[in-house]
C-alpha cells in the first residue's frame, strides 16, 4: 500500500532513538533477515520517486523471509531489545523448544528406500538412508504418517507439526540459499569509513563517484547494490 514505508521506518527510528539514549549499538535489520531490511536498503541504495511498496519480488532471499517463520526470525531480536512482553516471550520460547524437540527426533530417525516403500512412501530407490526430516520434505508425507512408523517422535500439537512440515519442505532450497546469504553477509562485514574520499579513488568513473558520495554506503555490500555501481 505504501504505508509500510512510514510504519517500518517509524519502528526502526523509535528503536534506534531509544538505543542511542542508552548509549547502545545501533540496531540494523538486513536484507536476509526481514522485509524491513529489504525496504530500508532499497531506499538507501536505490531511492524512490513515490511511496515504497513492499513486494516479495524485491527480496532475493524471499524463501527465508516467509510469513510462517516471521516469529522465528524476529522475536529473538525483539527479546534482546526488550520489546517483547513476558507473556509473548514465554509463548515464543515454548514454541521454539517444541519445534526443536520434534526436529531433533526427526533427524535421529532414518528410513531406507526399501523401508519407505513398505509404508507406501515414495522416495528415490538409490539405497540412501534419509532422515525423517528429509522424508517429510517429500510430497504427500506428513507428521501423522511418520508417527505411524516411529512412535518416539513427540506430538506437540497441530501448529508445531504444521511449522515443522513447512520447514521440511523448504529445507533443501534454504540450504542452497544459505550459501548466497553467507556471501551477502561477508560483504556486509566490510565497513566503509565515513571519512572516505571517493574523488581520490582511481578506477571509478565520475558517475560512480557521484553516486557513492550521494548515497554514502555503510558497507561494501550496500555500495555494490547501488544502481550503476
Predicted regions: what they are:
Residues 1-2:
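Short FAD-binding loop at a beta-strand-to-alpha-helix junction that anchors the flavin cofactor
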Residues 23-77, 81-86, 90:
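Mid-to-C-terminal Rossmann-like scaffold of FAD/NAD(P)H-dependent oxidoreductases
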Residues 58, 70, 75-80, 84-229:
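Extended, charge-enriched "interface" segments that sit outside catalytic cores
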Residues 6-27:
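Internal hydrophobic alpha-helix adjacent to the cofactor/substrate pocket in enzyme cavities
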Amino acid at each position: 500500500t505504501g504505508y509500510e514505508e512510514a510504519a517500518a521506518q517509524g519502528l526502526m527510528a523509535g528503536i534506534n532513538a531509544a538505543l542511542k539514549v542508552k548509549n547502545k549499538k545501533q540496531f540494523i535489520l538486513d536484507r536476509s533477515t526481514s522485509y524491513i531490511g529489504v525496504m530500508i536498503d532499497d531506499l538507501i541504495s536505490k531511492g524512490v520517486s513515490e511511496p515504497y511498496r513492499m513486494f516479495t519480488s524485491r527480496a532475493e532471499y524471499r524463501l527465508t523471509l516467509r510469513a510462517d517463520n516471521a516469529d522465528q526470525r524476529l522475536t529473538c531480536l525483539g527479546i534482546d531489545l526488550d520489546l517483547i512482553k513476558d507473556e509473548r516471550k514465554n509463548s515464543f520460547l515454548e514454541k521454539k523448544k517444541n519445534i526443536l524437540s520434534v526436529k531433533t527426533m526427526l533427524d535421529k530417525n532414518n528410513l531406507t528406500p526399501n523401508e519407505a516403500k513398505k509404508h507406501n512412501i515414495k522416495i528415490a530407490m538409490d539405497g540412501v538412508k534419509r532422515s525423517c526430516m528429509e522424508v517429510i520434505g517429500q510430497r504427500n508425507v506428513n507428521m501423522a504418517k511418520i508417527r505411524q512408523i516411529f512412535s518416539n517422535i513427540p506430538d506437540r500439537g497441530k501448529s508445531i507439526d504444521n511449522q515443522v512440515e513447512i520447514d521440511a519442505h523448504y529445507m533443501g532450497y534454504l540450504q542452497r540459499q544459505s550459501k548466497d546469504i553467507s556471501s551477502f553477509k561477508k560483504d556486509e562485514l566490510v565497513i566503509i569509513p565515513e571519512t572516505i574520499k571517493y574523488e581520490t579513488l582511481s578506477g571509478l568513473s565520475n558517475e560512480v563517484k557521484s553516486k557513492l558520495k550521494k548515497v554514502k554506503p555503510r558497507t561494501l555490500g550496500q555500495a555494490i547494490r547501488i544502481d550503476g555501481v
